[in-house]
């Protein structure tokens, strides 16, 4: 699996629709300071589900939308789409048979985000789920920032373990276990409520039966 291209529009400095192709397994983006290289990395993280504006070097999510300049009007929305080559079937589940998988996210000026998988609207969770264990995600080890080495050195043990588990592909199983445990907990809570209702019904039935027995006695 590899990234084939990125399509951006209205995202930070990419005001016009822009398509950046990655024709091989190794590509480089070079240019002077301020030309938008970091914005490309921000775009990848954002479309993969990043929800913290601070991690995208902004104050609010609306900051990722092109804010206008002396010669250009502000954009009303931002859009980023990633196209992945999935010939190796690395992305499994219902998408394993797709040779290409597109992931898209848009945001309006009011901050409302919409996600898409292969042009079908989906939830943020759907995107994070299919990429679990692949090394891709809003804060995965696949996206290495300049400060990453410092962060790793100063990471708490549980934070460092999370990186190692993602690299080893364990995170997908931990997430599934967490979801299963959550479903089991909800099921137990529902069973307890059913048991309480059953007890209440039994009490009411007993009360009604006693009333029924006492009626002939009164007569």
What is each stretch, according to the model?
Residues 215-219:
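Short "domain-exit" segments at the C-terminal end of structured domains
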Residues 2-210, 214:
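Gly/Lys-enriched N-terminal cap/neck module of very large, oligomeric protein machines
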